[in-house]
Curated annotation (Swiss-Prot):
Principal location listed in the UniProt entry: virion
Protein name from the UniProt record: Protein UL20 homolog
Membrane topology, from the record: Multi-pass membrane protein
Compartments, as annotated in UniProt: Virion; Host cell membrane; Host endosome membrane; Host Golgi apparatus membrane
Organism whose genome encodes this protein: Gallid herpesvirus 2 (strain Chicken/Md5/ATCC VR-987)
Domain of life: Viruses
Family membership noted in the UniProt record: Belongs to the alphaherpesvirinae UL20 family.
Length: 234
């Protein structure tokens, strides 16, 4: 060991010392090629869309998103509410309208049919409006629904159930002719007890479905507003 200026020490050359100038450049080239192949393989294996999702979510969730187990799927799943909403939208509502149609043909009374089809068309129109808003906003990298759009869709989603429940209640419980059908089963009215009770059950099911769909839209947003003390447009 020999001491040089500024207090630094250097090891003297011996028989085991390899001068830096004598190192073959081939090893450096090999290491560079190996690193390049590793990076190429990594770029092929990594799903960059998932990487972007992780980076985006990390801005909201912090480092937790990078410590999620591999078995945990961060992508959206079909929840029970989504399944029930699909059934009520494409199965239950049309089925109730078919019952109203059967009652209109059998009892010569098309009031339930007109009411059911009108509210159903209104519901589908509201749903299409919501989908249009979401598509237009997401296309421009905005939140799915703005505050005004939330209020508008929420009001329309509640308007349908209110109208249906109010009118159907009056037709079932305050209409004298319909009450006679229920109590007397008058054969002159070209109907029977089975059809009467079937349309009553359909009206009840339609009312519950309409109210549930409206609550399904409003409740998460009201809950978020109560918890975060702010209106979150989603």
């Amino acid at each position: 060991m020999s001491k040089h200026g500024f207090g630094y020490y250097a090891t003297e050359a011996n028989e085991y010392t390899i001068p830096l100038d004598d190192i073959d450049d081939g090893r450096s080239d090999t290491d560079a090629k190996t690193l390049g192949s590793v990076l190429t393989q990594l770029s092929e294996e990594v799903d960059w869309d998932d990487a972007v999702d992780y980076a985006t979510m990390s801005s909201y969730l912090g480092d937790y998103v990078f410590t999620i187990p591999n078995s945990y799927d961060i992508h959206p799943k079909f929840t029970r509410y989504v399944v029930l909403f699909g059934l009520s939208t494409f199965v239950l509502r049309p089925s109730c309208c078919l019952i109203f149609l059967f009652y209109a043909i059998y009892a010569q009374d098309n009031r339930f049919l007109i009411l059911g089809t009108t509210i159903t068309a209104f519901f589908y129109g509201t749903l299409m409006l919501e989908m249009y808003y979401m598509y237009a906003n997401i296309k421009y990298d905005l939140m799915p629904l703005s505050k005004f759009q939330q209020v508008l869709i929420g009001a329309l989603s509640m308007l349908g159930p209110i109208i249906f429940v109010a009118i159907s209640y009056n037709m079932i419980f305050k209409d004298v002719t319909f009450m006679k059908k229920i109590l007397a089963f008058d054969t002159n009215l070209k109907t029977s007890g089975f059809v009467i009770y079937l349309v009553m059950i359909a009206s009840l099911a339609y009312s519950i479905t309409s109210i549930s769909d409206a609550i399904g839209f409003l409740l998460p947003r009201l809950w978020t507003r109560a918890v975060l003390k702010s209106c979150v447009p989603f």
